[in-house]
């Protein structure tokens, strides 16, 4: 659900001419161009065709930091030429687009979320980075790992892909540090009503 909200921010910025679908991310985020990434466009990122489907060599908790994941992608080498193939960009989707939006506007992702999506739609209970409020934290559901997960991998037998979410994902997203961080692809927290109002 987070990716759709993030995409809404991007579409609104394109609508106003701040971003353009066929312009490289490096137009606004020059450091991203390193290692042959200078031709990856907003369209490639939105359509999971950027060639960067996963972070490499990043600590789990660092994935909750848009700055840390942005630096990780600046140093990354694409798995394929932009647009040549498609693979689900589970978490990198949010960093590619979130960091680009920040660079293009000079605003934080949380600010863009509030002013581009939430305020115009009258949404109060949705965050990318849960505020430090014990009452809010108490309302967040606890994630549980699949009961039939293989103890050696943490992956349920129904999933064929070894990169599928495992029991470590539940632990990661249950941590206060990750809930307080900004993960535009998967870390938004909100009520069902707030997400429904967006969609």
Model-derived features with residue positions:
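Short, surface-exposed loop or secondary-structure junction motifs
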Residues: 35-199
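Active-site SXXK
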Residues: 1-22, 97-101, 198
């Amino acid at each position: 659900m987070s990716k759709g909200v993030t995409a809404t921010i991007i579409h609104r910025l394109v609508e106003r001419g701040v971003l353009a679908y066929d312009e490289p991310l490096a137009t606004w985020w020059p450091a991203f161009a390193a290692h042959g990434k200078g031709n990856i466009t907003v369209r490639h990122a939105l359509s999971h065709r950027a060639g960067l489907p996963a972070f490499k060599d990043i600590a789990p908790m660092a994935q909750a930091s848009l700055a840390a994941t942005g630096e990780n992608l600046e140093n990354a080498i694409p798995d394929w030429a932009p647009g040549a193939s498609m693979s689900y960009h589970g978490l990198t989707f949010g960093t590619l687009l979130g960091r680009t939006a920040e660079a293009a506007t000079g605003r934080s992702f949380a600010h863009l979320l509030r002013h581009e999506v939430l305020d115009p739609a009258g949404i109060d209970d949705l965050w990318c980075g849960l505020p430090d409020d014990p009452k809010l934290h108490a309302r967040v559901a606890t994630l549980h790992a699949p009961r039939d997960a293989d103890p050696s991998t943490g992956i349920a037998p129904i999933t064929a892909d070894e990169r599928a979410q495992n029991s470590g994902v539940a632990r990661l997203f249950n941590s206060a540090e990750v809930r307080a961080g900004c993960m535009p692809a998967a870390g938004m927290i909100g009520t069902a009503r707030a997400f429904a109002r967006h969609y």
